[in-house]
Curated annotation (Swiss-Prot):
It is an enzyme of class 2 (transferase). SUPFAM superfamilies: S-adenosyl-L-methionine-dependent methyltransferases. Its main location: cytoplasm. This is Ribosomal RNA small subunit methyltransferase A. It catalyses: adenosine(1518)/adenosine(1519) in 16S rRNA + 4 S-adenosyl-L-methionine = N(6)-dimethyladenosine(1518)/N(6)-dimethyladenosine(1519) in 16S rRNA + 4 S-adenosyl-L-homocysteine + 4 H(+). It is found in: Cytoplasm. PANTHER family: DIMETHYLADENOSINE TRANSFERASE, DIMETHYLADENOSINE TRANSFERASE-RELATED. One of its GO terms (molecular function) is RNA binding. Keywords: Cytoplasm, Methyltransferase, RNA-binding, rRNA processing, S-adenosyl-L-methionine, Transferase. The gene is rsmA. Belongs to the class I-like SAM-binding methyltransferase superfamily. rRNA adenine N(6)-methyltransferase family. RsmA subfamily. InterPro entries: KsgA/Erm, rRNA_Ade_diMease-like_C, rRNA_Ade_Mease_Trfase_CS, rRNA_Ade_methylase_Trfase_N, rRNA_adenine_dimethylase, SAM-dependent_MTases_sf. The keyword RNA-binding applies. Its EC number is 2.1.1.182.
Length: 289
């Protein structure tokens, strides 16, 4: 079977099966070969790789990954796409389709049972309405993932890749960059999909580090500190950290002084390193209470 990454090839498959796109599932199929190639290049897929794909659609990206990788497991929630995928992937015995909701899948078990225990790469054109939960599931759970290369809404990619002091920098930037080095792989304007979405897209690469870059003593306190600091962006740290719920203003002032952080600064100006120092001091303070 030829590549599916063209408007005509995709339309032919859709018409053959009388497939109806679901807005609620965020179904927009990629129809540009150049972007497919950039995704493959950004994911650095090699012969021995095990790949997890979420939302394979009609198998456009799945096919191209299956030609290179050791094994591709595609997780698709829409049962109406299963017979289509069975057809479009029929000549690739190293691809497998799982008809489940990714957010309900035990990824650790899936990797163990179907992908030899890993390591794995997540490569996908993600449904935009659940992009962040999917990415964070792979980063926060004990999954042997080395790379996440995904098509996401442009605004989400900008936030994941943002640096301190910019309008896009926030809790998501820190949550992703705490685990990964990030890069923008490609831009994908809305006309590269059918049906055409209302937003432009970006392929972002998240390369998971072998070792933790930041010296964080208590991750729970760290992420709570980050969340509180961005709770109300216009508030200074002296005021926003009150959102933690267990520190009074005098204690916050003392902690900021010890961290060598001006109490008038706002959360969006702090680097991850500064948040690490700040949360470690908060953790020490809480532990000694």
């Amino acid at each position: 079977m030829d590549r599916l990454s063209s408007h005509n090839a995709t339309k032919e498959v859709v018409q053959k099966y009388n497939f109806k796109f679901s807005k609620s599932l965020g179904q927009n199929f990629l129809i540009d070969s150049n972007i497919i190639d950039k995704i493959l290049s950004g994911a650095r897929i090699t012969r021995g790789d095990n790949i997890i794909e979420v939302g394979p659609g009609i198998g456009t990206l799945t096919r191209e990954m299956g030609k290179i990788a050791e094994k591709v497991v595609a997780i698709e929630i829409d049962r109406n796409l299963i017979p289509i995928l069975k057809d479009t992937l029929s000549d690739l015995d190293n691809t497998e389709v799982v008809n489940q909701d990714i957010l309900k899948v035990d990824i650790q078990e899936l990797v163990k049972d179907k992908l030899n225990g890993g390591p794995v790469k997540l490569v996908a054109n993600l449904p935009y309405y659940i992009t962040t939960p999917i990415v964070m599931k792979f980063l926060e759970e004990d999954i042997p993932v080395t790379d996440i290369v995904v098509m996401v809404q442009k605004e989400v990619a900008d936030r994941m890749n943002a640096i301190p002091g910019t309008k896009d920098y926030g809790a998501l930037s820190i949550a992703v960059q705490y685990y990964c080095d990030t890069e923008i792989v490609a831009k994908a304007p809305r006309h590269m999909f059918i049906p055409q979405p209302n937003v432009d897209s970006t392929v972002i690469g998240l390369h998971v580090r072998d070792k933790r870059k930041y010296d964080v003593h208590n991750e729970d306190i760290f992420f709570k500190t980050v969340k509180a600091s961005f709770g109300q962006r216009r508030k200074t740290l002296l005021n926003s950290l009150g959102g933690l719920g267990f520190l009074n203003k005098d204690e916050i002032r003392e902690i900021l002084k010890e961290a060598n952080i001006d109490e008038k600064r706002r959360g969006e100006t702090l680097s991850i390193e500064e948040f690490s120092v700040l949360s470690n001091i908060i953790n020490t303070k809480v532990s000694s209470k």
